[in-house]
């Protein structure tokens, strides 16, 4: 029984192989959104935006009003892992405080 080796191209000793350049692209970004509900106090939403998204009071209030009027509001734009972490932190905090506030992420 003969053992066959996989055929590979033969190169002369003077042959130089060029490395193919890989195009690097930035990571996909995700929007973190808060969804409106009829029970979560507006002040709690403002506090969440300040604590977890580093928004100043004025910006947090504007986002909260967008959530209230339009049904959802963008808290920020993050890479997938950071967005998922923020969604989990906000959701856990809201549940522990007894509020039904929903925080989700979607690809930007």
Curated annotation (Swiss-Prot):
Stored InterPro entries: ClpS, ClpS_core, Ribosomal_bL12_C/ClpS-like
Pfam families (alphabetical): ClpS
SS bonds (residue pairs): none
Coiled-coil portions: none
GO biological process, one term: protein catabolic process
SUPFAM superfamilies reported in the protein's UniProt record: ClpS-like (SSF54736)
PANTHER family, A to Z: ATP-DEPENDENT CLP PROTEASE ADAPTER PROTEIN CLPS (PTHR33473:SF19), ATP-DEPENDENT CLP PROTEASE ADAPTER PROTEIN CLPS1, CHLOROPLASTIC (PTHR33473)
Function as written in the Swiss-Prot or TrEMBL entry: Involved in the modulation of the specificity of the ClpAP-mediated ATP-dependent protein degradation.
Known partners and oligomeric status: Binds to the N-terminal domain of the chaperone ClpA.
Family the UniProt entry places it in: Belongs to the ClpS family.
Official protein name in the record: ATP-dependent Clp protease adapter protein ClpS
Origin organism lineage: Bacteria, Pseudomonadati, Pseudomonadota, Betaproteobacteria, Burkholderiales
């Amino acid at each position: 029984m003969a053992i066959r080796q996989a055929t590979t191209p033969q190169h002369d000793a003077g042959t130089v192989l060029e490395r193919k350049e890989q195009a690097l692209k930035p990571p996909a970004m995700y929007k973190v959104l808060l969804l409106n509900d009829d029970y979560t106090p507006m002040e709690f939403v403002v506090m969440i935006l300040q604590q977890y998204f580093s928004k100043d009071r004025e910006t947090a209030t504007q986002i909260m009003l967008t959530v209230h009027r339009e049904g959802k509001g963008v808290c920020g734009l993050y890479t997938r892992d950071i967005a998922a972490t923020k969604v989990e932190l906000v959701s856990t905090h809201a549940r522990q405080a007894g509020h039904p506030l929903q925080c989700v992420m979607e690809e930007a």
